Amino acid sequence: MGVIDNKEQRSLDEINSTIEFNDSQRTSQKFLAFLGPGLLVAVGYMDPGNWITSMQGGAQFGYTLLFVILISSLSAMLLQSMTVRLGIATDKDLAQMTRHYLNKPTAIIFWVIAELAIIATDIAEVIGSAIALDLLFNIPLIIGALITVFDVFLLLFIMKFGFRKIEAIVGTLIFTVLMIFVFEVYISSPNLIEILNGFVPHYQIIANHSILYIALGIIGATIMPHNLYLHSSIVQSRKYNRHSFTEKAQAIKFATIDSNIQLSIAFIVNCLLLVLGAALFYGVNSNNIGGFYDLYQALRTQPVLGVVMGSIMSTLFAIALLASGQNSTITGTLAGQIVMEGFLKLSIPNWMRRLVTRSLAVIPVLLCLVIFRGNESKMEQLLVFSQVFLSIALPFSLIPLQLATSNEKLMGPFKNKKWVNICAWGLIIILSFLNIYLIIETFKEL
């Protein structure tokens, strides 16, 4: 384990300690000042990579997998609360802390895996955004993918106005996605009794291989490696007394509540996706729900909805997909900066860092489009591959997080409680096993 240098550059230095609040403010006002970072984290739990598994799960198996979404969301809340404590208690992000734990060659391996995970995450956003542009404006996929490169410059422009503006934009886009799916689920008239029953565990989830496979897909796509790096850094954007136990404890409390609130919203969105799939397609034409284009066309031609409402719902679906892709663009590029600076102590101009990350994600998408001549199903298959790689990369983020947050020398009084350690190690073992199983099954079906 390396020696921690407290004089090294702060995590995301341009936003670190930039959001102030007055000590004389009431507790409720201080809490409001801490609302925001959880929004950026919640984006990863409802990105385009999650959409297919949730809607396919509903279309093929009704409401059965709502229980899996619930367990996945509770697990995410636990892990994200650990990253909050790590960031605030140590004033370091997960990338910096991982570097301190490992020797240089091993740290470089972990850095490469983290970078590839961010590129894999970005691939899903590029594909989701490009498909949304095609559905909404008939823009060819290759042009849509190229357009996404310029998203990074939009982020750079917004950053000039402060981190709060980014949080506000992300919050607006999340609210847009949420309202669209609330409306679509309302129109689809789901069975409320069956929805409630879906939150009860069913033995078929394990006994039925097909259900288990989709369940593993939901779990594997829920907890994203880049979110762990991102959250441990952006919680430090609030200006509190770094030497006061009381203020750190309060910061951890507020940031954890913020995280749980926003992840609850992500949980609702994922439930709405599954409910929509179940209400419209379960027992009707569930086998035809394979990708974004299939979902769009199925919504458009759904007999239950009618011509006008089907057109409205399919268009709203595409708008939500575009909003989700743009949201994830913001968080992915920030996570890329955190990983590079944290692992390598390398700081390059923000525009270059973000342009390189996005370009590396766009290249495989463009190659896929050129080689397969714009084949839509191949694009969606590439998205699935990107999610599989995220499953492989996950333990390389979870294990350093658990080791660091259970270390009393690093965390002091903020170290993990015994029950947290038990739950965290249990989650790591179960998630790693399930992800390995998912990878094997994915390659079997190729």
Swiss-Prot record:
A Pfam family of this chain: Nramp
Subcellular location, record wording: Cell membrane
Keyword Nucleotide-binding included in the entry's annotation: no
Keywords: Cell membrane, Ion transport, Membrane, Symport, Transmembrane, Transmembrane helix, Transport
GO BP, sorted A to Z: iron ion transmembrane transport
InterPro entries: NRAMP_fam
Cellular component per GO, a single term: plasma membrane
Major subcellular site: membrane
Entry membrane topology: Multi-pass membrane protein
Domain of life according to the entry: Bacteria
Keyword Membrane applies: yes
Homology family: Belongs to the NRAMP family.
HAMAP family per the UniProt record, alphabetical: NRAMP
Described function: H(+)-stimulated, divalent metal cation uptake system.
Protein name: Divalent metal cation transporter MntH
Naturally occurring in which organism (per UniProt): Staphylococcus haemolyticus (strain JCSC1435)
Gene: mntH
